[in-house]
């Protein structure tokens, strides 16, 4: 793709963030080539950071008119992107979403634009590689990069380029984003999958590219990992209930984990009640042993524990949302409109 073709379209690069002083500088620096090669602006949509994030971004903005700091009063990522599009997206062709906790190749945005122009896709999504630094992070990364942790999700498995119905959000036509109403701001988790559901329903096409990808760093401790996946489970449940969709087979297996754990408590009455839970735990531990022996990875056993935490938290969050909605949902619940 020629530089003229790239610069013929205008891109809005949005970075949702909250208290990212440790990362935001390197993220913006990494986008320097994108600002040179593309007709693009960067909007850092900040949810009220109390560390040095805002002052760092303000410094960049004072030095470069292509960088802007924007307030996000709602603090959540879905609203961060919506408000950026509403404020700065009117004359832009493409929205590019950048995560403050990720690492990206220097030509990431350029590759996305090339793929969008070459395929005519309405959305371009990317694969995600998880990398750890601490021992627990390395174990969690091993789990998340394996079928034990991702269930064979293609955007986690390095699949070749293909048309898909969901992936890690990277680029989207502003016109498509606006037409379907942007992100649903009632979603604090799983807003990307929920938007992709509406995108597909409206007839738009999503392209998974293998020409670029991002690196993600998982949570470094047990409790943050549990909370993250508990939130993912709740978000996925809300998505299914909103669109009256059904879980896939890949999702059904971890969905059963929390009920199995509750059922195992009945072992005090009859020991056979613990068998299903024991089978699941044994399968996870066996897979971890295979990772350790078959792939000669010393973090295999700990990866099994990380996967069990993710499975249980995701399942618990899912059922918490389902049961909570059944008890609390009124006969009619209006959807909160996005701020675009």
Give the residues covered by each predicted segment.
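Glycine-rich, basic loop-to-helix element that forms the pyrophosphate-binding segment
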Residues: 72-90, 111
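A recurrent flexible, glycine/aromatic-enriched loop bordering the glycosyltransferase active site
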Residues: 131, 153-175, 188, 194, ...
């Amino acid at each position: 793709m020629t530089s003229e073709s790239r610069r013929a379209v205008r891109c809005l690069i949005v970075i949702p963030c909250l208290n990212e002083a440790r990362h935001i500088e390197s993220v913006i620096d990494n986008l320097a080539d994108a600002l040179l090669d593309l007709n693009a602006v960067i909007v850092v949509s900040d949810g009220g950071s109390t560390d040095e994030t805002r002052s760092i971004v303000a410094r960049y903005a004072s030095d470069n008119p292509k960088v802007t700091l924007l307030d996000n009063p709602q603090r959540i990522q879905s609203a961060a992107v919506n408000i950026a599009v509403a404020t700065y997206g009117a004359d832009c062709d493409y929205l590019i979403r950048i995560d403050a906790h990720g690492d990206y190749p220097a030509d990431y945005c350029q590759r996305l634009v090339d793929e969008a122009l070459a395929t005519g896709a309405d959305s371009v999504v990317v694969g995600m590689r998880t990398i750890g630094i601490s021992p627990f992070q390395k174990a969690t990364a091993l789990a998340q990069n394996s079928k034990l942790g991702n269930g064979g999700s293609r955007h986690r498995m390095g699949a070749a380029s293909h048309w898909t119905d969901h992936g890690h959000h990277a680029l989207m036509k502003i016109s498509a984003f606006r037409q379907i109403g942007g992100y649903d701001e009632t979603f604090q988790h799983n807003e990307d999958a929920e938007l992709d559901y509406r995108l597909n329903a409206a007839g738009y096409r999503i392209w998974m590219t293998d020409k670029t990808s991002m690196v993600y760093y998982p949570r470094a401790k047990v409790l943050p990992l549990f909370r993250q996946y508990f939130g993912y489970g709740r978000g996925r449940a809300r998505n299914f209930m909103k669109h009256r969709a059904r879980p896939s087979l890949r999702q059904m297996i971890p969905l059963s984990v929390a009920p199995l754990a509750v059922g195992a408590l009945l072992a005090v009455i009859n020991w056979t009640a613990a068998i299903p839970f024991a089978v699941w735990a044994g399968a996870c531990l066996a897979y971890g042993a295979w990772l350790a022996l078959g792939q000669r990875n010393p973090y295999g056993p700990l990866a099994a524990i990380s996967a069990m935490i993710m499975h249980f938290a995701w399942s618990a969050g899912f059922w918490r949302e389902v049961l909570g909605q059944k008890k609390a949902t009124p006969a009619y619940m209006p959807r909160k409109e996005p701020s675009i």
